[in-house]
Amino acid sequence: MVEPNISAYLQNQLRQAQELEENIEKLATQRYQLDLSLKEMQKTLDELNKLDDNTPIYRTVGSILYRVQDKKKLVDELDEQIELTKIRLSTLEKQQKSLEEKYKELQNAIRDRYNQENKKGATS
């Protein structure tokens, strides 16, 4: 809730801070979901590597289950997905850190401006 006696500038800064906070939360959620997906892919890859090459392997696509003919191709695809997910996670982490830094800077700027406005109001 925005106080009615603060300047329009401060109200705008507070809205920006709120938007940054929401974006940080969204990125954290995306990172969490990707991290879960990455762990699942790594576990799947570990299990695939334990299997003998002659063991039948099945894969689901949507609601369809089909037999995989080429285990190596499946392992390679999974490796590629893991690498892409790691890159995406790294990118999201950098974005989140950047937004967190901007948020801290904005918090400090808001605090300073609020204190300045209160000093002016107290001396008037």
UniProtKB/Swiss-Prot annotation:
It is found in: Cytoplasm. CDD domains: Prefoldin_beta_GimC. Keywords: Chaperone, Cytoplasm. InterPro entries: PFD_beta-like (IPR002777), PfdB (IPR012713), Prefoldin (IPR009053). One of its GO terms (biological process) is protein folding. The keyword Cytoplasm applies. It holds the Pfam family Prefoldin_2. The keyword Cytoplasm applies. GO terms for cellular component: cytoplasm; prefoldin complex. Molecular chaperone capable of stabilizing a range of proteins. Seems to fulfill an ATP-independent, HSP70-like function in archaeal de novo protein folding. Heterohexamer of two alpha and four beta subunits. Belongs to the prefoldin subunit beta family. HAMAP family: PfdB (MF_00307). This is Prefoldin subunit beta. The gene is pfdB.
